[in-house]
Amino acid sequence: MTATDGGPGGSPAKRPVAGDGTSIRPMDVDLSTRYLGLSLASPIVAAASPLTGDADGLRRLGDAGVGAVVLPSLFEEDMLAEDVGLAAGLEEGSRVFHEAREYFPDLAAEKGVADRYLGNLERAKGLLEAPVIASLNATSRGGWTRYAKLLGRAGADALELNVYFVAADASRNAADIEAEQLELMSAVCREAGVAVAVKLSPFYTAMANFASAVASAGAKGLVLFNRFYQPDVDLDNMTVLPRVSLSRSADLGLPLRWTAILRPILPEDVSLGLTSGVHTGHDIAKAVAVGADVVMMASELLAEGPGRVQALESALREWLAEHGYGSVSDLRGSVSAASVENPEAFERANYTKTLRSLERLGR
């Protein structure tokens, strides 16, 4: 038996109801999902944040029933900064023996930042039954393939490659930048030994094409989208300030659109994680409906605490049961671009309609 529910742009989407005509109880709704080949008890994943880098935060997230956690990133900049002191001391020798310069940074970093990260990974694995996803924040290939392999061997259930890059160099074109990033992704996916998800920014020239290329490079998942921290200006001191702002539900629209568009384009075995703007049970339901396998949450958990996971799962169960869904799998992709009568609703079809709605607000 099926019923219909309104989709984007008024397009009906199929909605399953209990086959025997009985209502579904919230407690019977199955929230389990699969992400990067891993079995998760919940679609709620704790995104990288101070909570996932702290033993008490990890313990509380585990007690709340989170589906998985992403550890704070191992940053290329941290390892390079740690190398500076010793590198300066060997500068003269490096000029004579250039090969020493190539090997030295990785060796120095491995004794510091990387070792500490591996210790944090081991601690997280000991505290949690849920999968633990390590995170690499890279800007160049460098030694990242080796660190990806180390993290996989150290027990990470999967890796998230966070490619944070602002294309501010006018001498470089989009094709060259994308080719360089794809080479990095391919190398990491090839050497990691575990499934790799790539966390993308929304600023690629042709997102659908690039996302497909990332999957072809070996990524088993995409996370949409990387939340850039935007600078601000201090007018009193005429300086640039870093600003960290938490997301809001209003930020959900962009990742919703692209998850809906990419779900039917990407291979079925490529997972999709949606992040930025997920704060309520309804937000989670929307993300799953357009095709997300999981939602990544940081802002809401930082603001409300890890215990918020239980309230969100309860709200999601209630919504699913009320609308006749016995599991998140039943809902997944029911409002993707391939499932609605008017897929252009995710592109431009409602553009003029939206502008007219703004005109009414001004009257």
Show which residues each predicted segment covers:
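C-terminal helical cap(s) of enzyme catalytic domains, especially alpha/beta-barrels
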Residues: A81-S94, V233-S247, L302-H323
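Compositionally biased, low-complexity flexible segments
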Residues: A3-A13, V17-G19
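N-terminal capping/small domains of soluble enzymes
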Residues: T22-P131, A138-T145, W319, G362-R363
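Glycine-rich phosphate-binding loops at beta-strand->alpha-helix junctions
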Residues: V278
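Hydrophobic faces of well-ordered beta-strands that scaffold small-molecule active sites
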Residues: I44-A47, V69-L71, V132-L136, L159-L161, ...
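Alpha/beta catalytic cores of nucleotide-metabolism and tRNA/nucleoside-modifying enzymes
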Residues: I24-M27, S247-P267, G281-R363
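Alpha/beta enzyme core
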Residues: R59-A64, G126-L127, T139-G273, G281-K286, ...
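Short gly/pro/ser/thr-enriched loop/turn and capping motifs at secondary-structure boundaries
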Residues: E76-L80, F165-D169, Y229-D232, L301-G305
